[in-house]
């Protein structure tokens, strides 16, 4: 388990029912099951990642998140995770509202485009390539970029309350000036 994922896993209450949107290879759900006694369901569109998750004993549905989460009732889960998923979704507001509808707590993370090193790279006239944003501008899977401050505004716009927010840098939690010093942003949100 990578350190950033371990920090995020610590935010999930033991024994929670967890939905992981864009679960990838199922590593986080398997960790939550094995160390925190959580039950979980992953959603993944990529067939190879889905197979890797199933091989870890994780239950996974192959769904396109752009279609919404209408198959789940309100409050079906204690926690809904979107780890590095939101920048890859076209209908961001709907995805965020659906996260809050089907779960009591939403935990989201994404690369923070306002990190100081990215700001510095932009001064050279080029888009950055970093561990958190490892692609050139022309081949990135990200549909959009986000900042810590922008997400705070989006959450309010969607009628959500931010209950906890911080940055991550090198697996370390950053609480002071998280928008400037955190290369990744982490938010816990609930319906207001």
Which residue ranges define each predicted feature?
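Class I SAM-dependent methyltransferase SAM/SAH-binding core
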Residues: 31-68
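A short SAM/SAH-binding and catalytic strip from SAM-dependent methyltransferases
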Residues: 79-90
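Conserved alpha-helix/loop element of class I SAM-dependent methyltransferases that forms part
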Residues: 1-15
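Short conserved loop adjoining the S-adenosyl-L-methionine
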Residues: 68-74
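S-adenosyl-L-methionine-dependent methyltransferase catalytic module, highlighting the catalytic core
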Residues: 93-101, 105-192
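Glycine-rich SAM-binding Motif I of class I
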Residues: 26-30
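Class I SAM-dependent methyltransferase "Motif I" SAM/SAH-binding loop
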Residues: 22-24
């Amino acid at each position: 388990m990578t350190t950033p994922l371990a920090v995020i896993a610590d935010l999930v209450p033991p024994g929670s029912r967890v939905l992981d949107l864009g679960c990838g290879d199922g590593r986080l759900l398997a960790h939550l099951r094995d160390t925190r006694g959580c039950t979980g369901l992953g959603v993944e569109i990529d067939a190879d990642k889905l197979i890797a998750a199933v091989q870890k004993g994780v239950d996974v549905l192959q769904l396109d998140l752009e279609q919404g989460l209408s198959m789940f009732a309100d409050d079906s889960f204690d926690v809904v995770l979107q780890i590095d998923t939101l920048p890859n979704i076209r209908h961001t507001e709907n995805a965020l509202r659906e996260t809050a509808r089907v779960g009591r707590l939403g935990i989201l993370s994404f690369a923070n485009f306002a990190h100081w090193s990215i700001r510095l790279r932009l001064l050279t006239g080029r888009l950055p390539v970093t561990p958190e944003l490892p692609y050139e501008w022309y081949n990135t899977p990200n549909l959009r970029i986000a900042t810590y401050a922008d997400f705070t505004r989006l959450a309010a716009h969607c009628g959500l309350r931010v209950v906890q927010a911080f940055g991550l840098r090198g697996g370390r939690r950053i609480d002071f000036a998280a928008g400037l010093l955190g290369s990744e942003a982490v938010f816990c949100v609930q319906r207001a």
